Amino acid sequence: MNETQLENLCLDWFLENGWEVVHGIDIAPDSSNPLRKDYKQILIEADLQAGFERLNPHLPVSCFEQVLQKLNQPESLDLVTNNRAFHRMLLEGVPVTYKKQDDWVHDHAFLVDFNHVHQNRFVAVNQFTILGTKQPRRPDIICFINGIPFAVLELKSPTDENADIWDAFNQLQTYKEEISDLFVFNEALVVSDGVTARVGSLTANQERFLPWRTIKNEDDKPALEWELETVIRGFFDRELFLDYIRFFVLFETDGEKTIKKIAGYHQFHAVREAVQATIAAANPNGDKKAGVVWHTQGSGKSISMCCYAGKLLQQPAMHNPTLLIVTDRNDLDGQLFETFSNAQELLKQTPVQANNRDELRKFLAERESGGIIFTTVQKFALLEGESEHPLLNGRHNIVVMSDEAHRSQYGLKAKLGNDGTYKFGYAKHMRDALKNAAFIGFTGTPISSEDKDTRAVFGDYVSIYDIQDAV
């Protein structure tokens, strides 16, 4: 099979998955039905305008020019900075202004409808020629939603012994240099020779290009002959792909450098399962045990926790919940806090850290909705003279996210102390303080079968990704 045959097979899979397929040559500037003014144009403006009018009936049509200008004229010379700015507009809407009678109105135009798949137009285009800084370039397949290119697939022939997926990876690096405007809007890159396929972010190196092994959920792992088919049926499932670009993309600043991180398949499905389990557990009639996510160490637990928080905060069923993130040690608290602080596009709020017991109690007692609060488990210790922890907040939409829950003295049962008084573990104090909160645990090590305390607080596993899965 040569590269053209693989490309056609790939387009067939997109078609079967509900995407429209268009050949780049048929919409080129010099075709009989041009959808581009010239070969430098990246956006399919007719689709973008149709999407704008469909998704923004509250705005005058004149606002479309403002949207087009903001998308076509990024503010920075740095690609990743522009990509981050676009991602923020994608989630929050593009700022527009218009005159209504005598007043100027400030509003937002939305580019994608994340809640209604059928309100969007999904098009896979092959051989879309773009005039680069040195020569014309033709990525194999570009995935457009409402005229915006969200993903690029670069393919190599499975039978060519002199080419492999890393040649495709190198080709993408060249494209980023020569046709960088295409990547301002990018949310995923795929390299494949059909048999092997890897998915990575705009800034990912080879090591961070990872397989995508699932289709509908984490148990749906068909042993397909072509890994590329799994990527197209799973990662590019239209509903899942929208969820992905909305809740599973993070930016981290490391000194001067911005890194874009996207979730792996195990993180994506674990978070989706955990959010559903939490909604059920947090219900006034729920058991308040949202479960335990066990993902082997080194598999990106902090990203999973951050994406879970971002998705949970936006669930209408949670009525703007408060999240309390509990760690066992100060250094963990700091690391995780940094990841969350970097993710404000996703979380839409700034997390706070409780520095002592009094501050923690104040944060929790005053909160009527929303908020992300970090603390260590030790701050639930009793004050002098207290025999039990006072109730701080009785709301049902508080979720306690625990990092490495089972490391601490999480006991619910009383133990007789040396001074003849009964002492409870922190879990009992947390439960007393937040009597209607739901609890979820994230861990990199399995819970022992004898550990009944952890299960009593959190319930059973909601997702497992162990060493075997990670290989």
What are the roles of these predicted feature ranges?
Residues 26-27, 352, 444:
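Proline- and acidic/polar-enriched loop/turn elements at helix boundaries
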Residues 330, 351-361, 377-382:
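Conserved helicase motor
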Residues 175-177, 310-312, 357-361, 385-388, ...:
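A generic local structural motif
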Residues 325, 373-375, 400:
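Hydrophobic positions in the central parallel beta-sheet of the AAA+
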Residues 192-193, 327, 402, 443:
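Short beta-strand/turn micro-motifs composed of small residues
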Residues 355-373, 389-392:
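Conserved motor-coupling elements within RecA-like helicase/translocase cores
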Residues 1-322, 331-347, 368, 378, ...:
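ATP-dependent helicase/translocase motor core
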Residues 165, 201, 210-211, 378-388, ...:
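Signature of the SF2 helicase/ATPase Hel1-core->accessory helical subdomain module
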